[in-house]
């Protein structure tokens, strides 16, 4: 399965173009995604969004704004003008959610884009499990520390 979920900030405003022939909107942008254990380090992930999703991102998201995207990783290659083979890796955005509104971190309206299937609940805890889902009377067999292989 090829599925990716990222939360990051745009490094610059999205670049919106339209494909020749079909006229399909194509938005390209880069997300700066903080690393989990080293908050002072980030990875810069190239993203591409097509159609209405791309148009919406280009219209409402600007440099520095926080965005959640879900999609898949796509690799490719092309021949550069100097004749060398260049390789690319992009996240193709399938859906997205605005994380902040650009005014102090308030949550943005996620209803702008079609293709946005996070439904405004991205990052919110899933309350479908309760403490009662786990029976405290389960038969728990004690394990001796010497039986643990590490």
From Swiss-Prot:
The SSB domain covers which part of the protein?
Answer: 1-100
Q: Which GO terms describe its biological process?
A: DNA replication
GO molecular function terms attached to this record: single-stranded DNA binding
**Which portions of the chain have biased composition (kind: Acidic residues)?**
141-150
DNA-binding recorded as keyword: yes
**Entries under PROSITE patterns matching the protein:** SSB
Residue numbers spanned by region Disordered: 129-150
Q: Does the keyword DNA-binding apply?
A: yes
Q: Where is the composition biased (Low complexity)?
A: 129-139
Give the InterPro entries listed for this entry.
Answer: NA-bd_OB-fold, Primosome_PriB/ssb, ssDNA-bd
GO cellular component terms given for this protein? nucleoid
- CDD domains recorded for this chain? SSB_OBF
> Keywords assigned by UniProt?
DNA-binding
On assembly, the entry states: Homotetramer.
Query: Matching HAMAP family, A to Z?
Result: SSB (MF_00984)
What PANTHER family does its record include? Answer: SINGLE-STRANDED DNA-BINDING PROTEIN
Q: What is this protein called?
A: Single-stranded DNA-binding protein
Name of encoding gene: ssb
